[in-house]
From Swiss-Prot:
Disruption phenotype: The testis size, weight and histology, spermatogenesis, and sperm morphology and motility are normal in homozygous knockout males. Disulfide bonds: none annotated. This is Sperm-associated microtubule inner protein 4. The modification Phosphothreonine is found at T219. Keywords: Cell projection, Cilium, Cytoplasm, Cytoskeleton, Flagellum, Phosphoprotein. It comes from Mus musculus (Mouse).
Length: 588
């Protein structure tokens, strides 16, 4: 850019920067969304623009000064004949910031609705400082919101939260409208009037106890916010508020901030609060296990109590159901069919033991010798001496017929059943009503185990001595192939004196195995095994001989060693060193 000569009032410097600033620098990296290319797209383009568009040089800040290029100010009597050229001058007035200190005209209209700023209501215009005549701000004689004086010492919420609702029947809005108040609604304290003359040493107080119909319900101040007044208002005394239990909505019944649909929901909330009063011990240990869920909705019962005139009907929440212990019932059998409302099975004649030679209608010669019920009754009523010999003959004949005709293997000892005890009519009382399942069940439990006699072989000796069945009638009888030697010898000595009476009164009993042994199955229906006593095991004697304390004593005696003395100087093994010294130095 060329310098224009002939202008002494202009400086010889060019305005502008030789380097393009990043503010005006634009390309695809800095302005990716710029659609049109500006003339200052690059450094080369900027230099080209400076050369193509020459600019006039400006004076030394003439346009930026508050003065300017002005004619020379001289008095009229001293002015020259020809007008001198204009010179740079600022004049004799100092304008400062170039404007008036206080505006003399009306304030400029500001449209604040177009922006988010708001105009101040205190000052007349939007200036930051008021005018000198209005600078004296007066006190506002109006209450202003404050916090409670003890706000830092009061919890915001309840320390022990409650479930009380504004629609509660006993502490809500309905209870506060009743006169007189119920005992569950607190009331305000009585008004106190203090009569004290200045200078008088005595203090007089007048207490006004209003009637119950004129009492007012207790309400804590500061439900919304606390207000304070200047000291010159209300006899120059500040307002002191009582300390509420909480700062956030202290009166739940005055301002129903929670939405409640009906009084039924309020009753449920109150019962829910009372359910939390139960201790964990009372909840877990009720005598019948843990407590069942509580019935919180008893609004219908309370409405009925109110209609019937019951006063103070407010029971504790009760359990929805109580656990009960039921006696176990068998899954199969006659009792199970009766409890399931099924048709009971018909009583059938007991089928004799299976035999290959027997048919469903004709029995083999072996099973035809089993005594009938008439013979059993005769034996029970008429105890004759000849029956004993007849019974021995029957047994011998049974053995012979079984060995000749039957193909079944003959056991070592044939088990003959004590049919007298099976058909004892007096032990089973008659029950006409078959639907009384409990009587049938307990009759089966009261049955004693059916004894079965056994005639022993004289050629077998057992090597395991067991208890005799004569002394323990409820013990299970040993297996017929494991009879004791003492019993055999005793039977040999009593063979001469053996009678049918002794045979019925002192039999050797066999255990009744209803699952595996078919010949010992009774001729009655199914009998539960709950009342059948079990045999005594020989392990009980071994268990009684064991003593835990003696075993521990023997263990300690076996591992007891001689106590070592730390004062002894050990030449071998582990040394007893303490802080570099042997232990015997500390005991000398």
């Amino acid at each position: 850019m060329e310098v224009i000569h002939g202008r002494p009032h202009c400086c010889r410097n060019l305005e502008g920067a030789d380097i393009l600033s990043n503010t005006f620098y634009s390309n695809g990296l800095h302005t990716p969304y710029e659609t049109t290319i500006r003339p200052t797209a690059s450094q080369a383009r900027y230099q080209e623009l400076r050369e193509a568009l020459p600019q006039c040089r400006l004076r030394w800040g003439a346009d930026r000064e508050y003065g300017g290029v002005l004619p020379v100010s001289l008095p009229e009597e001293h002015r020259p004949k020809c007008e001198p050229p204009r010179l740079m001058s600022k004049g004799h007035q100092h304008y400062g910031f170039g404007g008036e200190i206080w505006p003399k005209k009306l304030p400029i209209e500001q449209y604040y609705y177009m922006t988010q700023n708001k105009k101040s209501d205190v000052y007349g215009n939007d200036s930051l400082l008021p005018k000198p005549p209005n600078s004296a701000v007066k006190e506002i004689c109006s209450p202003y919101p404050i916090e409670h004086p003890y706000h830092t010492h009061i919890s915001r919420g309840s320390v022990f939260p409650t479930f009380t609702s504004p629609k509660d029947l006993y502490t809500g809005i309905k209870a506060r409208t009743q006169q007189p108040f119920p005992p569950t609604v607190p009331t305000k304290a009585c008004d106190t009037t203090i009569l004290k003359t200045r200078g008088n040493p005595y203090r007089y107080e007048l207490l006004d106890f209003p009637m119950d119909s004129k009492k007012k319900a207790l309400t804590w101040p500061g439900q919304g916010v606390y207000y304070d007044f200047p000291k010159f208002v209300e006899k120059n005394k500040p307002v002191f508020y009582p300390k509420p239990p909480k700062t956030f909505a202290p009166n739940s019944s005055v301002n129903p901030w929670d939405t409640m649909s009906s009084a039924k929901d309020a009753n449920i909330q109150r019962n829910l609060e009372r359910s939390h009063w139960l201790t964990s011990y009372a909840h877990d240990f009720t005598g019948l296990g843990p407590m069942s869920p509580l019935e919180l909705d008893d609004y219908h019962e309370k409405e009925l109590a109110e209609l019937t005139g019951q006063i103070g009907f407010d029971p504790q929440p009760q359990e929805k159901f109580h656990p009960a212990l039921k006696t176990p019932r068998p899954l199969d059998g006659r009792i199970a069919r009766l409890t399931q409302n099924q048709r009971p099975l018909e009583a059938t004649v007991q089928i004799p033991p299976p035999c290959p030679d027997c048919t469903p209608r004709v029995l083999c010669a072996f099973h035809t010798f089993i005594p009938t019920s008439a013979e059993i009754m005769a034996m029970n009523n008429n105890l004759l001496s000849g029956i004993t010999h007849k019974n021995q003959d029957v047994e011998e004949k049974i053995k012979e017929e079984q060995g000749l005709m039957s193909t079944c293997p003959l056991p070592t000892c044939y088990e003959s059943k004590d049919l007298t005890s099976l058909y004892d009519v007096q032990s089973f009382p008659k029950i006409t009503d078959t639907k009384k399942t409990d009587d049938l069940y307990w009759r089966q439990l009261e049955m004693k185990p059916l004894p079965i006699s056994c005639s022993k072989s004289n050629h077998y000796i057992d090597y395991e001595p067991l208890k005799s069945a004569y002394r323990d009638p409820y013990a299970m009888c040993p297996n017929p192939v494991r009879l004791s030697k003492s019993n055999i010898l005793q039977n040999k000595t009593d063979t001469a004196d053996f009678t049918f009476d002794n045979f019925l009164s002192k039999p050797e009993f066999l255990g009744m195995n209803m699952e595996s042994n078919e010949e010992t199955r009774p001729l009655l229906d199914w009998i539960p095994r709950a009342g059948v006593p079990k045999h005594h095991s020989n392990l009980r004697n071994l268990r009684n001989t064991f003593s835990k304390s003696m075993a521990q004593k023997r263990l300690h005696n076996s591992i007891q060693e001689e106590q070592k003395d730390l004062r002894d100087k050990l030449q071998c093994g582990m040394r007893h060193q303490f802080f570099g010294y042997n232990g015997h130095h500390f005991y000398n």
